[in-house]
């Protein structure tokens, strides 16, 4: 058989392989030239840091899953910025499941992602579809005009009047105090704060006093935690979020929504409550109970977990450094004494400078949402990350995702917080350099999507911290506790191994 015949036979038998190779090569060439054209058009440069994690980015996906399971994904995300070819450039490009993903901790890039005229350049891409089975059409899943309209309604519900009555927190603190005093030895305070956070949230949202003896309460809390596990997995899978949709997830969503429907109905049947009730206020704008439920679910996620985790990480740090608690108690004693909570008000709590410094420092080291993602609605650029020194703009194609890791920004010694950025030091917040940080400090996001409940969370946490300092002389960390703590990254971040401590009464 001649060479010509052999070649013809090979082509005939393996035409599909040749066709795919030809198609793949041609598409790569076209993509290269199209990218070059776009870079010239948008005056962008190639990214200086590019991490190639193998074919299709499959290795990167499995590595992220492994760290997620081991509760080391946050530390892994931070380390990636330190292990790029040029660590002084705070942006890199990698490939995940076939898609090029931009990761950044650069405040200038983050500012573009968050502060462009709303919905102009970036949105949340597949995030809405990924979490919608759990959160419905809540504020966290809406985009565009629907989001604007809903946020406009909700914004008015977080004014000064709705959070002014701080003494409403006192019965809940007494419940927490009773639980703490009933413990023998070391116990996980994070679990107690999660219970407290849910009870506070339900009273604020539904006007109901709900405790563990309410029917299906335990089922709800377990299902809610499971929903958050699934939501995190679905977000990680990106375009393939639909793969994480088994019967456990569907069942958990049903339990959560049924419990919330029950609370909405009970709340609407009792409108005589003279306190501020979120559902009652929302019902003035709509009679759609499903819509009310969906907003309530988003608010539960934001309020219950954010406050609980802020308090848990605060106690974790105070239990390791007793002088901070002593300094806190001195400030409280000098202003109001250690015996009575009667003088605590919205305004007086905001005047506790060291209380605010402790909470700011906790939020710096342990932000409630340590990472986030945006997707380009059109081809555009980020201001930094390209060129020979990383100071040139880089291209962001339509549909391309950009992840920003706020905790990496907070812990970077170069960007703002100095060589001791990994050290819990509340006194840093009295330095003049801590003013007007902009996107260098993002405990509650920034721009149009800044957390509506920011003041509520801070006042609630301030009240609890002051009352704990008035009640307990010391808090002691378990001698076997690991530090820094492993961080479980769901939608919010919590201590993966809990916060085991022991309280000592005054």
UniProtKB/Swiss-Prot annotation:
Its cofactor is heme. Its EC number is 1.14.14.-. GO terms for molecular function: heme binding; iron ion binding; oxidoreductase activity, acting on paired donors, with incorporation or reduction of molecular oxygen, reduced flavin or flavoprotein as one donor, and incorporation of one atom of oxygen. It comes from the Eukaryota. SUPFAM superfamilies: Cytochrome P450. PROSITE patterns: CYTOCHROME_P450. It comes from Candida tropicalis. Together with an NADPH cytochrome P450 the enzyme system catalyzes the terminal hydroxylation as the first step in the assimilation of alkanes and fatty acids. Keywords: Heme, Iron, Metal-binding, Monooxygenase, Oxidoreductase. It is an enzyme of class 1 (oxidoreductase). Gene3D superfamilies: Cytochrome P450. Pfam families: p450. This is Cytochrome P450 52B1. Heme binds at residue 451. Induction: By various alkanes. InterPro entries: Cyt_P450, Cyt_P450_CS, Cyt_P450_E_CYP52_ascomycetes, Cyt_P450_E_CYP52_fungi, Cyt_P450_sf. Belongs to the cytochrome P450 family. The gene is CYP52B1.
């Amino acid at each position: 058989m001649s060479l010509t015949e052999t070649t013809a036979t090979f082509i005939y038998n393996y035409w599909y392989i040749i066709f795919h190779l030809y198609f793949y090569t041609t598409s790569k060439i076209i993509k290269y030239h199209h990218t070059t054209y776009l870079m010239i058009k948008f005056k962008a440069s190639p990214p200086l840091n590019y991490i190639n994690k193998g074919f299709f980015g499959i290795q990167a996906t499995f590595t992220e899953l492994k760290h997620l399971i081991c509760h080391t994904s946050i530390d892994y995300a931070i380390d990636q910025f330190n292990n790029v070819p040029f660590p002084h450039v705070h942006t890199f490009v990698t490939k995940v499941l076939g898609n090029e993903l931009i990761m950044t901790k650069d405040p200038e890039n983050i500012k573009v992602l968050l502060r462009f005229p709303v919905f102009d350049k970036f949105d949340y891409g597949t995030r809405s579809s990924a979490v919608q089975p759990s959160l419905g059409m809540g504020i966290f899943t809406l985009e565009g005009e629907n989001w604007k309209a809903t946020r406009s309604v909700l914004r008015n519900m977080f004014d000064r009047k709705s959070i002014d009555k701080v003494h409403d927190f006192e019965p809940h603190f007494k419940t927490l105090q009773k639980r703490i005093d009933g413990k023998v030895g070391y116990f996980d305070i994070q679990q107690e704060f999660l219970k407290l956070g849910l009870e506070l949230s339900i009273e604020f949202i539904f006007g109901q006093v709900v405790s563990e003896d309410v029917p299906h309460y335990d089922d709800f809390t377990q299902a809610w935690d499971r929903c958050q596990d699934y939501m995190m997995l679905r977000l990680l899978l990106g375009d393939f979020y639909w793969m994480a949709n088994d019967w456990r997830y569907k069942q958990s969503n049903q339990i959560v929504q049924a419990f919330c429907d029950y609370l909405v109905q009970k709340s609407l049947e009792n409108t005589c409550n003279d306190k501020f009730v979120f559902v009652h206020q929302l019902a003035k704008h709509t009679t759609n109970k499903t819509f009310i439920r969906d907003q309530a679910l988003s608010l539960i996620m934001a309020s219950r977990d954010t406050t609980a985790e802020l308090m848990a990480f605060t106690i974790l740090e105070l239990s390791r450094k007793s002088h901070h608690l002593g300094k806190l108690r001195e400030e409280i004693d000098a202003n109001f004494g250690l015996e009575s909570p009667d003088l605590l008000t919205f305004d007086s709590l905001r005047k506790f400078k060291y209380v605010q410094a402790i909470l700011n420092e906790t939020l710096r080291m342990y932000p409630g949402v340590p990472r986030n993602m945006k997707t380009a609605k059109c081809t555009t650029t980020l201001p930094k990350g390209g060129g020979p020194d990383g100071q040139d703009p880089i291209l962001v194609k339509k549909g391309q995702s950009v992840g920003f890791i706020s905790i990496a920004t907070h812990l970077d010694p170069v960007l703002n917080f100095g060589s001791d950025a990994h050290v819990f030091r509340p006194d840093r917040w009295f330095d003049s350099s801590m003013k007007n940080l902009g996107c260098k400090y993002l405990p509650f996001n920034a721009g149009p999507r800044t957390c509506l409940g920011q003041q509520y969370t801070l006042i609630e946490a301030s009240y609890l911290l002051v009352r704990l300092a008035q009640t307990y002389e010391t808090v002691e960390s378990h001698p076997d506790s690991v530090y820094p703590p492993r961080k479980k990254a769901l939608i919010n971040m919590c201590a993966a191994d809990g916060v085991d401590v022991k309280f000592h009464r005054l």
